[in-house]
């Protein structure tokens, strides 16, 4: 996982100066493309199955070579204003491939279109969905790309 993490980190550091002066729409489109690229890099290693919720979108990203039980709940970064299901699936594909475990990603509702606590409610709904599916807290973890730190 170290190589993939370095690759992702270098990509994000490279794009950060460009994104700083972009409109919200351009930033969102750029993140979508980054997610599509990352998913494509792992397409031979993972299966992706979308799972819609009433207020947001989610997806299962499952490694073809599953080596562990349990699940990772992945919540994308983006400062609560950016990030989509495509973006989340890209990072989830890397996690699933490298860790050999299922990843469920939730593309929570974004600001400014949706006010607080919409994103928090969506994250909680995704977590409760996993609990209902039988994933006990001790057999799951949450990976968050620091939404507020972007």
Describe the predicted segments one by one.
Residues 65-67:
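Short strand-connecting beta-turns/loops that link adjacent beta-strands
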Residues 1-61:
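A glycine/proline-hinged amphipathic helix-loop "lid/cap" segment
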Residues 86-106:
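Short amphipathic alpha-helix adjacent to the substrate-entry channel of hydrolases
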